[in-house]
Amino acid sequence: MTLRLTNTLTRRTEPFTPLRPGKASIYCCGVTVYDLCHLGHARSYINWDVLRRYLIWSGLDVRFVQNFTDIDDKILKRASDENSSMTAVSERNIDAFHADMDSLGILRPDSMPRATQCLDGIRALIGELEAKGAAYSAEGDVYFAVMKHAGYGKLSGRDLSEQQENAGGRVADAEGARKQHPFDFALWKAAKEGEPSFPSPWGAGRPGWHIECSAMVRAELGDTIDIHLGGADLVFPHHENEIAQSEAATGQELAQVWMHNGMVNVGGQKMSKSLGNFTTIRALLESGVSPMTLRLFVLQAHYRKPLDFTAEALEAAATGWKGLNAALGLGERHGQSLEWPATPALAPVALVAPSNHPSEPLEPLQQRFIDAMDDDLNSSGALAVLFDLAKPLRALANRLERGDRADRPADELAALALRWRLLRDLAAVLGLRREADSESSGPGDDSTNQDEIQAAIDARIAAKSAKNYAEADRIRDELKAQGIELIDKPGGITEWIRR
C-alpha cells in the first residue's frame, strides 16, 4: 500500500506521488499574529506536523514552509487598542507562537516568511496579473478580476453566477463601487490615514491577505508545489483566491494536493476567536494539561473530522497518555537494570526507517502502523498500534515501579527491549515523546490514584486475556463503585473517566 491522501481539489482520496522523486514541497497557511493561538490552531499544526514527520520517516526530503501574516486589519486594531504598533503586536505574538508550538513538539518549518518581508515579490506578482488583464487598479486599490479566471470556484465548488444572483440585495459601499464584479477581491489596498503603508506603482498602501500567500509560495517553493495545507475554514475564500491569483499568473497548477483539517467544536459550534468560545494553548498547558496529552487528544480523531472539545475527552486523553508514557519511560528508567543495550537518544527529525527493525515478531505491528498512516493519515489507527506495543511494557513498568523483580528469561527481556525501541520510534513519527512525571499529569490529576487505576486496568486486561471474565467483570464493577467508568475501544485500548 502507498500513501493515499484526501485531495480537496478532486474530492477523492488518491495515491500521493511527489512531483520530484524523493522530495516533497509543502506550504502551510500560518497564523495572523494578533493574539495567542488557541486549540484550533494546535489541532491544525499537530496534524500537519504528523504529515511532515511521516513523509520524512518514509524517506522523503521534505521542504516545509509556513508563513506569518504580520500586517492585517486585526493586527492594526489590536495595536490601536493597546496604543502600540503593528510591529510590536506582531513580534510579541510571533514569539508566543514559537513557544506554544515548541511546547507541543511541533517541528519548526524550514522557512517562515513574513508578509512584510516579501513585499517585492507581492508587488511583482500583482504587476504580472495586471499586465495579463487579470487585475485592475481603481483609486489606489488593485483588484483581481474573478470573471477573467475560468477556473474560479474549482476548489470550493462555488458557482459565481449563482452567487451573483444571491447577492442582488447587497448594500453598495465605496469599495463595491470601485469593483467591476461584486466578488473581485483586493490585491493591494490604498493607504489609510494613520495606518502603516508601503510604496508601490499604484501608490502607497499594503497587500491584501490572499496575494501574500501566493507570492510566498512562489518565492519559497516555485510555481507548483506538492501539498498545500490549511484548515477547512480557509477553502473559501482564501485558498480559492490563492489558486486564482497564482494560476492566472503562471498558467500552472498551484498545488497538486490540497489538504484541509476539520474544526474543533465547543458545544456544537466551531471554536473561534470571533465567537469568543476559544481556549488558548497557553491556558490549557497552564491548567495542568501536559503537551503530550494535548497532542494525543488531537490525534485520537481523524484530521478531516470535527473534534469535540470537552473536559471528559481531555481527561480520557490524559489517562491514555499516562499509560503510554509509562511504557515509553521504561527504557530510560529501567533499561540498565534490565541489561538492555544502550540506545541513542532519538533526534527530533532523525526518524528510524522501517527497514531498521528486523525483529520478525514486531513486523506485523509496524506494518499495521504503516497501513494506518498510508490510509489518509489514520492517526487513531496508528495510536492503536502504539497502545498494543505498550501493553506488556506498561505491565513490566508497573511491576518495576512497585519494586518487584523482572523475573523473565533473557530472550524475553531482549524481545521487550526491541518492542520498546519500536514503540519509541513509532511514537516519534506521531511527535509523541516521553514526559517526566511532573509534565505528564492531566487536569486535576492525582498521580498515586491514577497509578492504582491503571494497575487495576492492567489486571483486568490480563484477566480477559486469560479468559477469566468473572475477574475482569469484578475489577470493572469495583472501579465503577469508585466512580471510575471504563471505556473499551477498538485495538484493545481501555480508557477511563470519572463520573
Curated annotation (Swiss-Prot):
Question: Known EC number(s)?
Answer: 6.1.1.16
Reactions catalysed, semicolon-separated, are: tRNA(Cys) + L-cysteine + ATP = L-cysteinyl-tRNA(Cys) + AMP + diphosphate
Answer yes or no on keyword Flavoprotein.
no
GO MF annotations for this entry? Answer: ATP binding; cysteine-tRNA ligase activity; zinc ion binding
Record Pfam families: DALR_2, tRNA-synt_1e
Keywords tagged on the record: Aminoacyl-tRNA synthetase, ATP-binding, Cytoplasm, Ligase, Metal-binding, Nucleotide-binding, Protein biosynthesis, Zinc
Describe how the cofactor binds.
Binds 1 zinc ion per subunit.
Q: Where is this motif: 'HIGH' region?
A: 31-41
Motif 'KMSKS' region, residue range(s) on this chain: 270-274
Enzyme class, UniProt record, top EC level: ligase
Per the annotation, which location comes first and is thus the protein's main one? Answer: cytoplasm
> What cofactors does this protein use?
Zn(2+)
Localization annotation: Cytoplasm
Quaternary structure, per UniProt, is:
Monomer.
Listed name of the protein:
Cysteine--tRNA ligase
Per the UniProt record, the source organism is Synechococcus sp. (strain CC9902)
What gene codes for this chain?
cysS
